[in-house]
């Protein structure tokens, strides 16, 4: 009887711990979906894919801008942009107008305006007129 | 007539008011409760779906709790299919503004945390470099410098250690290299670069980079009172080690061009698949585009231009080989951390692997068609084509190789080598010692702050509590963010009630299914849906198509089930207990006995399997005990399922 009672107490304890342990055991494991989802589920249209990339760039830009000053060191920003582009399989992001349109969207999402906006625009575009225009297009297109 | 007119006006006004109300609350998000199962998140899990992205927290091995952002299909495939768990989805009605606020905040927090942990990783690399420069490798006991500092994509052209074996002055010999006379592809590229930037451009660039490396100084790691916040990037500090490896990558890229170096044999995949004429035309255009891009990239000022040039030279060579041979050739894009599967395991999962091969073939054919679509000849699509080809042809190798890579393709090739010892920053011992000391102080403070925000705790900081805390932070009115923190809870509660219908306290809701009940009780839930697990779906199909009693009996246990096969990833069990609750304790008894049996067997096989069987048996007992008390946790899981089939079967939901 005493043995049964101990067993029951242990069973309850184990059950409670397991139930509470919502996410206590976690590991990083690769899955088939890691490599196939971008192929199987990606939007079939060019505009769908480019929109996803723009949004990723915009989100990253917004997050960066909210944490920094307009004249901050941009190397870390560029490294982060490379990482965002790399996930989409893109290396030539700096030659891609979608990147700058995304940056413009991100600046608008971060509610940057006035002199701060002009400074970011010039720095992100490295003073290239075409790039600055593309950033402006992205900025104006964002609600 | 006048009365009719008034009635019509009243009716129009009434409809307009209803429409406005509907528009004000036109959005929704889903609160997801994932049922329990053995292994990952054994007690269940919680997540928030905002649009087509799902945010959830997970406890990592590092001891921290991390916010993850996943594509909804990936999340569902992982949890509902592979882990075989039902998901309970509650649709919560919110205004458009609230939805955007939640979504933007979760994205911001995800990105901020991601950057914070990336900086921690960079600090680790900086430390490794400083130690090597100080010639104190013994101080990094257990850490292999060669595994920490790598040159990505350089491994496509050079073997591990090959660059070290070269004389250090060999690469400097580039200064006096004659203009290229070669008509090889890389010779042509080199000539284009020289025409564009000058005859000795590559030599000058090489000298410039060398000088930059020599004059590199360690990063400035300023100690501030508070470095981190959950919704801000960490201080923008350029990593010393990354500046060094970026410069070295540039030197290697120039070296590849100067030597007109070919891809290593293990760096590319030669298929026997013929290229059709339309594909050849597309590839010729792509090759020309790549050449133009490379001419620009070599002159880029972005920090990682060297890596980009290496990847694109490799792809240029692969595309050119494809055109020369009329057979598809691709750069190997499997990462160094790819998951391997042995021939024995392949044989064990022969049927599942054939489905994987069929899926891979379908994806590979699909991407070939995409490349031919007007406007779709993009770098991103070529990357997907490369990934799909790598996957398909690697799986085919399973027929004759002892082991293959089953998962691990990357969107960009990264085959790496350890940093060669050509040239190092010229720093004195004193400078290095001071830098290491500053780094130590910075890293200690950094880790302390990280732990303060993200140290996992079973009850006070887990995947459920952090979800609600993030919701609270998202809803905190901007005007109140700087207010006395003691007043913030009141504002948060008010906002939560106004926007979501109620407030759920993280402190009292740390158990997944309890939090799910709270969501039902507190939030403005419009709709509840139970999304079937993989086994649920298949079982329902069988019950419709066959005799119910036969199916129920056959599928009740792992010995006769056609829907589940035991695999070592699960602890062995006899009966499924997620169905009939009344018989659960009886089934649990058998399962507990099975777990004990596996543990005893495990003791005998310990010398052969390192305790794997024993551990599995012990887990089996642990999972079976709750069943004796009518709780169900374990449901069995699947190692290999068809992702394509999952997308097809669930297309209407996405």
Would you name each region that the model predicts?
Chain B
Residues 1-12:
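Bacterial N-terminal signal peptides that target proteins for export
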Residues 19-21:
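N-terminal signal peptide c-region/cleavage motif recognized by signal peptidases
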Residues 24:
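Carboxylate-rich, polar loop motifs that coordinate divalent cations or form catalytic acidic clusters
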Residues 30, 81-226, 230-231, 410-504:
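Active-site nucleophile-His-acid catalytic modules used for acyl/amide transfer and hydrolysis
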Residues 58, 67, 97-105, 109-110, ...:
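Hydrophobic alpha-helical membrane segments
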